[in-house]
């Protein structure tokens, strides 16, 4: 199957005449199709939830589209946590995966109901102290 761009050269030239560059142009239909495909692929696993890495594309409009398909937000900074909360993520919708993280970021992630994902066993004792 031959892949074709979601926008023609003529349409792209029309867009660039109207909007200054640089800008990002997203394929909403393609994003929705892929999010739906992931959701359907794992539908057999009732506990499965996909978490989108916010740092990959910190665009609240795209993240809201992904939320429509059951995706949560994988955050790695205070800014990403705050954005995810601001766009309506609820408890359990946020995964916080962060390295070399200030105490206040762990506290905030916990406060908003984030799932704290650790990659270092020594953080367990640290979190136990600060999240009491």
Feature map (PLM): residue ranges:
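A charged N-terminal "starter" segment
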Residues: 1-116, 122-131
